[in-house]
Each structure stands twice: as C-alpha cells, then as structure tokens.
Amino acid sequence: MFFQGEGSIDIPVQDIISWIFDQARYEIEKPVYIDASNTSRSISWRQARTLVRQLAAGLRAAGLKDGDCVCLHSFNDIYYSILVLGIIAAGGIYMGTNPGYTSHELDYHLRVAQAKFVISDPEMLDRMIPAAEGNGIPKDRIWAFTTRESQVIATTGLAHWTALLNHGEADWRRLDDPNHAKTTVVARLFSSGTTGLPKPVDFTHYNIIAQHTLVYDAHPVPFETSRILSLPFFHAAAAPSAHFSALRLGDPSYVLRRFEPDLFLTTVAKHNITECTAVPPIILAILSHCTTPKYSNSLQSLKIVRCGAAPLDKTTQARFQSLLAPDATFTQVWGMTESSCIATMIPYPESDDTGSVGRLLPGMEAKIINTDGDDITAPDTTGEVCLRGPTVVRGYFNLPSANESAFDKDGFYRTGDLGYCDGKTRKWYLLDRKKDIIKVRGFQVAPAEVEGVLRNHPRIRDVAVVGVYDAEAKTEYPRAYVVRQDQSLQEEEVKEFVALRLAKYKRLDGGVRFVDAIPRNASGKILKRLLEDKRDEKL
C-alpha cells in the first residue's frame, strides 16, 4: 500500500495553449505580467494571446518544425513567458538555460537537448554564439532578446526577436487527440538527477496542467492574489507558475529581472503583494534587509510564502514568520524537476513550525524503499522516497539508461531523498539526500561535472568533489579534494581553473583540500562517504 495525497480533482486533458487562451476567465485588458522596475511595461491576456499567435507564425516562417527545441537564454522579463508560449504554440519545445553559463556549459546543454534555435539576451551572446555555431545553429536562427532593438542590430548583426512578429498570426498547434496531451513534449528543462551531468527532462502538456491544478485549483484562497516573480525563469522551480499559471489565473505578477532585495521589498510593500515563492538564500537576504527601519514592515501584505529547492532550518523559518502579518503562512514545499516542481505542500491557511515539507498533493502517490530497492512503505519509516502521479514526468530525453535507473517498473521516480511520513499528521519530513548532488542557493551542482573539468588540469592527478555546508549562508558549496601531480599546485590556481570554465554557483567556494589519495572501491567508484569527516571542517 502506498501513501496517497488527500482528495481528488479532475485534471484537464488538453493542449496547454488552449487551456490558457480558449476562454478568458477574467478581464482581458487587465495587466498580468508587470515589470517591477518599470510598471508602465505590462502585458494583458489579450496582448499575450495576440503575441503568442504572432510568434507561432514567425517561428514557423523561420523554419521551426513540430518537436524542434528552442533555447531561451536570458534573465527574467515580462516577455520571457510570452516567448515560451509562442515556442509551444508553434509546435516547438522550450528549453531555458542559466544566464551565467559559460560557452562550455552552453555547448553541452544545446547538444544534449538537440536545440535548433536560440533566443538570447545580447549580454550573453559572446558565450552563446560559439556554443550555438558549434552545434550547427546558424546566425539566422539566433535572435536577440532585448528592448533595445536598434542597438542589437548595430552591435551584433542579429535580428531582434520582434522580427518574429512580422508574419501575421497563426493558430497554435492544437492536439487532435486529447490523450496526446500526455505524450506531447512542450518543455525540456534540466535536472542534475541523482548522478552525473545535468539531464534534459521532458515535460508534457498534461504534466504542467496537472501541476497547476493540484497546487492552485485544489487549494483556492479566499482573497485576491498578486504575486512577485523573482526566481530565475529558466529554472523548474519557477517555470510552471511563471509561464503558465500566471495567465491562467490572471493574478497581477510583478517580474524582477533577477532577485534584488531592495526592489523585492519595495515592490511587495508598494503593490500589496500577497504571495511569493522563495529559496533559502532569498529568505536570508530579506531577513538581513528587514533589520533596517526602512523595510521592517515591508512584508505585511504577504499572506502566503512558500520556500523550496533546499531545506530551511526551523529557527530561520520562525524568524521570517515573525516579519509577516498574523494571518500569513510561511511553509516549506518539496519537489524536483522530475515532479514538475511541487510534490508536497501545506495549503493556506494551515501553518507549520515543525520543519515539514507538507503533505502529498492530491493524486500523488509515494512509497519508501530501502538501500536494496525493497518496498518498506509504512508510516514513520525512513528510506528513499519515490513518487508517482500526474506531475511526474515520463523521463529524460534520449537517455534510456538514466530512465531505467531513475524510474521503476511501476512508474515511480526514485528521488534520491531520504525521508518519512508522520503517521499521525501525514506530513513529510526529509532527513538527508541519498544523491551526491550539491545544492548551492537552490541551484543543483553535479560533482561529476566539476570533477570532469578538474581532471583536465595538467597538474591534477585525481579529484573528488563534495558539498560542504556553510551554516551562516544556509547553503552548500562545492569543495574539491585534489591529488596533485605537482606539489607546487596551490589552492587559488585550482579555484581559478574552475571559475574560468563553469558558472559562478559551481565554483569551489567550499575550498580545496590536497590529499594523498582519493578513496575508491574495486570498480573505481569514489567512496565519498570516507570524505565525510573531512567534509565537516568549518569553511
């Protein structure tokens, strides 16, 4: 017998663009996406629908065919989600990449996702163009995504993304069979998985509609909602709510290009924001800023705050709760890319101060297995949590071996997280992670990727990368254990080698430790558990 989410709710089985645009559920001229730094920039439902139809026509005119993958490489913007919807409307598959990626990382993501087109912020084109060209993407399939059209043409020679709007309008790709909603891919987002390099995860129409239905429709709130969107739009933690739920619900959504504490707090206070989703580093930044009189009451309008992507200790949770109004809730959620984001939550108006990540969403199932993979599902029993349900994806793109190891014969996804379900409250608690993935400020870092880079250093003989926890910053950082080929090699040289090749959050901020040997088993696998004692050293 498996654990099951309480209640049930019908999940629409249709294409996601029709789900959003076939029928308006609110005033169609009402601003939905609003630029937090310049509120005169906004997009309504009517404007969004027209833009999406124009993009569908423009992308098809540019040669996009059904199933082609389009990479969107940018910071947040009110038009970001419009481009996502336009890609899907044209029959394409959206993928997002981190603006901080190097050319090396972009090359990998474009290649593995089999991207055919790119839309990029001009600030990152110096890294994107070499990666795109290396994957056979010509410049006439790369568009610049910015508000400064003339500057783009003059400095890059690339077409501005608005050139895609000059081909009239076309209807979106509608599904001739509703069941195709469960098999047709609309987004290809990356997850580190349990081991190895980031993996492309395929989301269907049904996965995303199910995520919205189980989070929002199953738990309506008794007040008018407004949201602030500050998590990076390329990330699975933000994508479902930012790109799809916003226009379905019609709630005003204030978009930050990236998280900035001052703008965040000013926006919440000025526009009476009622709901936000955050990660622990954002919570810590807000706590720091709210010690000043200027911002001490900035969060009083918030009624729902959810924190996910990494654990948050109960003390920090209580400190943040004290900044909110008495009727506000601050709770933790749990999920992953493979579950289309949220899998467990505590719905409003219930609160929690126990450190729980909540209960399973309606329609979701969970079981617990031991280290041998045996089912040991029972209340208050700790083991690896496995998930099954409408939000759980079908698998990774073009990675059959990864799918075989991550999904069992019954369709359960092995999360790699150790936890248990309280027999009385049905709340879930996560104790540790089975997987080696390092979580840095909510972003996932695959040790194998950093190790792969370091192994290319001419003076490094062997290396292992693990996560070390910084109690002050409330996050993990990568640390490298290095066997030197040359004893003159210094820590800063190793750090710089990684910094030049990987994104900032993958850098060795946990330090470098030089050792005589890396512990391995007979098959050559690194025995990272033997580095546990060293890992506890203070940063």
Curated annotation (Swiss-Prot):
State where AMP binds: R188, L189, F190, S191, S192, G193, T194, T195, G196, L197, P198, K199
Segments forming a coiled coil = none
**Signal sequence, start to end:** none
Protein's GO biological process: secondary metabolic process
**Region (AMP-binding) location:** 449-525
Q: Which UniProt keywords apply?
A: ATP-binding, Ligase, Nucleotide-binding
Q: Which InterPro entries match?
A: AMP-bd_C (IPR025110), AMP-bd_C_sf (IPR045851), AMP-dep_synth/lig_dom (IPR000873), ANL_N_sf (IPR042099)
Pathway(s): Secondary metabolite biosynthesis
List the transmembrane segments: none
Q: What does this protein do?
A: Phenylacetyl-CoA ligase; part of the gene cluster that mediates the biosynthesis of nigerpyrone and its derivatives carbonarone A and pestalamide A. The biosynthesis pathway begins with the polyketide assembly by epaA to form phenylacetyl triketide precursor from successive condensation of two malonyl-CoA, presumably with one phenylacetyl-CoA starter unit produced by the phenylacetyl-CoA ligase epaB. For the nigerpyrone biosynthesis, the reactive polyketide chain is released as an aldehyde through the R-domain. A nonenzymatic cyclization and dehydration may create nigerpyrone.
Q: Which family does it belong to?
A: Belongs to the ATP-dependent AMP-binding enzyme family.
Would you tell me the protein name for this molecule?
Answer: Phenylacetyl-CoA ligase epaB
What phylogenetic lineage does the species belong to? Answer: Eukaryota, Fungi, Dikarya, Ascomycota, Pezizomycotina
Name of the gene this protein is made from: epaB
